[in-house]
């Protein structure tokens, strides 16, 4: 893949925990840039927003927002299609190159720290095979993570030492890679940017504010008909979707629909799980000292972010 031929165009990356307001900020910033004659488009990097029909639970940009600013990688996959880190890396990088080739500023939004790094950093990702992963996933569901961890320890002791026995998802991935390549080596980016002129901006909030926003978002999800959305998706294969069925909120509502617990418990577990995920996001993002942090509640947030983009446009800086 060719690198950025438009050396004066930055690649913008907005990061931050769930419910911090990244998506709305991205739309507002792109609109401001357009007025200043600097066209910009949004590239989703969240592995769940790519699924069609998962609108309420993933806070997919509204149709009005998508008409206002061009969005890439939104609602492009059926819920039965597996997603993966390598797929998102490929799709997002292609979208960035498409923007740059047209003289458009790409604005990456969403996703976990791992997905962000896989896209903007030089990172080689081992291959994936849905059938191989499905086989190990079935074994995980039937026998639990410790049995698989024992298998991993037998086949690759070093890999087993690096993965906690209870982390079923990582164990499945490690066994998949071993089946495909013969060994597993955790890939950690060395900090070399794929596009040298990349600017990362993060939104920060207090834990109290994050927790409240998440509770409010989940309440809004339920008010907007989230349970009905999950029920409809279950009718078109959500339960069989290896990736989509694990999305926060969707997994909990599916378990409620299966009779595992009542609706109030599904709602409670969604809030708890989302808060836990947000804290994990922040922990990983804080490890990247290239991220410039902005107060998500600052009244001049939009002005400051736009100013930072304009500064990047007029300088030759490289992170």
UniProtKB/Swiss-Prot annotation:
The record ties this protein, via SUPFAM superfamilies, to: P-loop containing nucleoside triphosphate hydrolases
Per its UniProt entry, what is the enzyme's top EC class, as one word? transferase
One Pfam match, by short name?
A: IPPT
For the keyword Cell membrane, the answer is no
Cofactor(s), names only, from the UniProt record: Mg(2+)
Role summary: Catalyzes the transfer of a dimethylallyl group onto the adenine at position 37 in tRNAs that read codons beginning with uridine, leading to the formation of N6-(dimethylallyl)adenosine (i(6)A).
- Name-wise, this protein is tRNA dimethylallyltransferase
Q: Whose protein is this, by species? A: Cutibacterium acnes (strain DSM 16379 / KPA171202)
Taxonomic lineage is:
Bacteria, Bacillati, Actinomycetota, Actinomycetes, Propionibacteriales
